[in-house]
Regions:
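Conserved core of the sugar-phosphate nucleotidyltransferase
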Residues: 105-194
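N-terminal glycine-rich phosphate-binding loop and ensuing alpha1 helix
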Residues: 1-49
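Short, high-confidence coil segments that cap the C-terminus of an alpha-helix
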Residues: 42, 90-92, 120-123, 212
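Conserved alpha/beta core of the MobA/IspD/sugar-nucleotide pyrophosphorylase nucleotidyltransferase superfamily
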Residues: 169-241
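A conserved hydrophobic position in a structured secondary element of the catalytic/binding core
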Residues: 49-50, 105, 180, 227
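Short phosphate-binding loop-to-helix
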Residues: 46, 52-98, 102-112
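Short, acidic/turn-prone active-site loops that include or flank metal/cofactor-
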Residues: 11, 69-75, 221-223
Length: 241
């Protein structure tokens, strides 16, 4: 199977303006993500850039970036435009949507995403970490994946921001990286927004409500996710060069 990692990136962030260009120990955050993906050596890597400034910083480190429309509603829409511009002969089988705000993403996480697509009966793959505290379950800023029986079936039954504590043993802290079989991405983009997607503000519910199968792979450690200035300061402390 031929795999392509696409990192969607745009400057317009309500909580942290110009987030992709934020400096982490001498390099823009988007460069850290790009380098981690490239060093994993499991797929070709490009950036779907919503702004020329992002395209330029990636090209300055020898990478490839596709300039997309700036006003896409989601990262999935952005990577789909980039895919069609970059791969006009449809040579790639799988597409990995890697968020541009995960500056210390590990190779094993990306490897897991790809291997799930190849080994499971799923349309989409994603990642999670076992939830260890009630506080995580009750925190609406943490998206949870619910699987009734992971030992028999790693297909996600539901995603939500809050669940009853009685479901603790079946909940996983969701990490927003997605692998798509190419035809699944094409199908997903063609679907209308679903009710749960709108109500919960979770794009992946569009797939669930249209009977697309999302496989969850477990990893041991959450990557840093940078959404606020506090997250950025934490990343700078952790990622000391």
């Amino acid at each position: 199977m031929k795999n392509l990692i696409i990192i969607p990136s745009r400057l317009e962030s309500s909580r942290l303006p110009n987030k992709p260009l934020a400096d982490i120990n001498g390099e823009p955050m988007i460069v850290h993500v790009f380098n981690r993906a490239r060093e994993a050596n499991i797929a070709n890597v490009i950036v779907a850039a919503g702004n020329i400034e992002i395209k330029e910083v990636i090209e300055n480190v020898g990478g490839e970036a596709i300039l997309t429309k700036s006003d896409h509603a989601s990262g999935s829409d952005r990577i789909y435009e980039a895919l069609n511009l970059y791969d006009k002969d449809s040579s790639y089988d799988n597409v990995i949507n890697l968020q541009g705000d995960l500056p210390n993403i590990q190779k094993d996480a990306l490897t897991k995403i790809v291997s799930l697509l190849d080994s499971s009966n799923s349309d989409i793959s994603t990642l999670g970490v076992k939830i260890s505290s009630d506080q995580e379950i009750l925190n609406p800023n943490i998206v949870k994946a619910y699987i009734k029986n992971l030992s028999e079936n790693n297909i996600v039954d539901d995603f939500d921001r809050s669940f009853d504590l009685s479901k603790k043993d079946f909940l996983y802290h969701h990490i927003g990286i997605y692998g798509y079989k190419r035809n699944a991405l094409e199908s997903f983009i063609g679907l209308n927004q679903s009710k749960a997607e709108i109500d919960r503000k979770l794009e992946q519910m569009r797939a669930i409500e249209n009977d697309m199968k999302i496989a969850l792979g477990l990893i041991d450690e959450l990557p840093i996710s940078v959404d606020t200035q506090e997250d950025l300061e934490a990343a700078r402390r952790i990622m000391v060069l």
